[in-house]
Amino acid sequence: MTHPLHIAVLMGGWSSEREVSLTSGNGVADALESLGHKVTRIDMDRDVALRLAEAKPDVVFNALHGTPGEDGTVQGMMDLMGLTYTHSGLTTSVIAIDKELTKQQLVPHGIRMPEGIIVESESLHAGDPMPRPYVLKPVNEGSSVGVAIIKERDNHGVPIHRDSHGPWQTFATLLAEPFIRGRELTVAVLGNRALGVTELVPSSGFYDYEAKYTDGLTTHICPADVPADIAEAAMRMALDAHRLLGCKGTSRSDFRWDDERGEAGLYLLEVNTQPGMTPLSLVPEQARHVGLTYADLVQAIVDEALAGKAAR
């Protein structure tokens, strides 16, 4: 760092990931203050544009998760205001938050992703959209919010009962994908570098929202105990996805790996352009593995945002 900056940290908001965002944002703000920066913490509300205009920051650190901080809405607002901000821009955010648009962007370039179909939630009560087991997920939510695995003879019924609890009660449309057996892997990318591969072993068997953000519910194995060619393939796919989508700052790519099929069993599930920065989050964990402190990581994200401004 050459000189202290005034940095607004945007956090909170009203998405289903509000609490995670507040934890991420306050952690980021504490780190920036420890580095000597002036920090304005903004818990985003409907008056966010006014508050940013009043703050006049050198750069905005976007620590929001979910809508509207991850879907291009806030990015478009900050573009109109002429603000410099961290992480991905408008177009990338619009594409990456939508799992189907992400597939359309990445699969033609050889990145393996599960085939899926968009289904009307109402239709699920008449019959399954594909053979079980399969996964139902919202098209544009993160942190495994609203994800359900539909198994043979499970307690959702055959077909899914109308009164059975699941994402079909909340979302009008869902993405249905074949369930991929195997192991959960994730790769963080910082700038132009894939940091490593972590395996996630949730105690419940499914890496859902609670498992992600509750201490002790998921074991993180970093680096993952996988063959070198699988680790290299996952990091290559994550870096390719980061570049093809036009991600900035940091991203996190989530994978399923069927370890009975070798590299052919490695599937990219989604790319998160606003990955968590909480004490349990995966990007800070992988950064530590390669020798970066939490403060180093935060500063690197800010530096890339400023470098992007200078290049324009």
Swiss-Prot record:
Matches recorded under Pfam families:
Dala_Dala_lig_C, Dala_Dala_lig_N
Please give the cofactor(s) recorded in the UniProt entry for this protein. Mg(2+); Mn(2+)
Q: What is its EC number?
A: 6.3.2.4
Tagged with keyword Secreted: no
- Gene3D superfamilies (alphabetical): 3.40.50.20, ATP-grasp fold, A domain (3.30.1490.20), ATP-grasp fold, B domain (3.30.470.20)
- Where does the UniProt annotation locate this protein? Cytoplasm
Q: Which InterPro entries match?
A: ATP-grasp, ATP_grasp_subdomain_1, D-Ala_lig_Van_CS, D_ala_D_ala, Dala_Dala_lig_C, Dala_Dala_lig_N, PreATP-grasp_dom_sf
Pathway, per record: Cell wall biogenesis; peptidoglycan biosynthesis
Q: Which GO terms describe its biological process?
A: cell wall organization; peptidoglycan biosynthetic process; regulation of cell shape
Name the positions where Mg(2+) 2 binds: E270, N272
Main localization (coarse): cytoplasm
Its Gene Ontology molecular function terms?
ATP binding; D-alanine-D-alanine ligase activity; metal ion binding
State the reactions this protein catalyses. 2 D-alanine + ATP = D-alanyl-D-alanine + ADP + phosphate + H(+)
For this record, the Gene Ontology CC terms, alphabetical, are:
cytoplasm
Cofactor binding note: Binds 2 magnesium or manganese ions per subunit.
Q: Where is the ATP-grasp domain?
A: 103-303
What are the boundaries of the signal sequence? none
Q: Which residues bind Mg(2+) 1?
A: D254, E270
Q: Which UniProt keywords apply?
A: ATP-binding, Cell shape, Cell wall biogenesis/degradation, Cytoplasm, Ligase, Magnesium, Manganese, Metal-binding, Nucleotide-binding, Peptidoglycan synthesis
Residues bound to ATP are 130-186
* HAMAP family, A to Z: Dala_Dala_lig
Which family is this protein grouped under? Belongs to the D-alanine--D-alanine ligase family.
Q: What does this protein do?
A: Cell wall formation.
Q: Which protein, by its recorded name, is this?
A: D-alanine--D-alanine ligase
Q: What does the record give as the organism's lineage?
A: Bacteria, Pseudomonadati, Pseudomonadota, Alphaproteobacteria, Sphingomonadales
Its gene is ddl
